[in-house]
Amino acid sequence: MSPIQYDYHHLPHVKTQNQSKKTLWITLVLTLFFTIVEIVGGLLSNSLALLSDSAHMASDVLALGLSMIALYLAMRPPNHRFTFGYLRFEIITSFLNGLTLAIISIGI
């Protein structure tokens, strides 16, 4: 009978967060840029479709901004109050984003 072997991957979480932070910044800036372009284009052309899509993209910018804040909070080291660190902020933000989408869909 062979012994049971356990393999724990102790990879640094911060390395993943740094890559995620870079990706989120790029996505946030691009989405914000296209949101502004759609608002200007919608106002200049009196297009309700462009203005509606820009409102949708503005909600995406808000969600990305919340994700960015959560990522920065999650990178804080543990302390006496939060002994496991601040990683739960990522989960709370994901829940809030999902809740916001549910409320918007009910409103539609």
UniProtKB/Swiss-Prot annotation:
Annotated TM spans: 24-44, 55-75, 88-108
GO CC terms, sorted: plasma membrane
Membrane topology: Multi-pass membrane protein
Listed GO MF terms: zinc ion transmembrane transporter activity
Subcellular location: Cell membrane
The organism's place on the tree of life at top rank: Bacteria
InterPro entries in the cross-refs: Cation_efflux, Cation_efflux_TMD_sf, CDF/SLC30A
Pfam families: Cation_efflux
Family per record: To cation A.eutrophus efflux system protein CzcD.
Listed name of the protein: Uncharacterized protein in glgB 5'region
Record key words, sorted: Cell membrane, Membrane, Transmembrane, Transmembrane helix
NCBIfam families registered for this protein in UniProt: CDF (TIGR01297)
